[in-house]
């Protein structure tokens, strides 16, 4: 049996726009992982950061509560070493609100940031082609 997905729906004189919760979750994940001090998403099944984010990993690391025209977000992250948990948490909240409201036009009611651990090794840098 497939899981029921929620949609954010907006309607105007031209018709309607339906945005899947998977799309919102992907926006949240991208915004959170771009914040300085975030090592990656916390993937509870493996208890590790993931550099390549799959839909399964997003669904375990980002939870949405859709209520009418606004949403509540919970995001589970790992902190990089030598960063302030409070500062990173606030930066993640700001980044998520901005990204979701700009990209999807949806009001974000709240962003709960769960810092599930600290990674002591350096974050791998993407390979640069020459």
Residue ranges and their predicted role:
Residues 1-85, 90, 106-112, 116-118, ...:
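Contiguous, often N-terminal, cationic amphipathic patches that form binding interfaces
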Residues 92-96:
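A short beta-strand micro-motif common to beta-rich folds, especially ectodomain repeats
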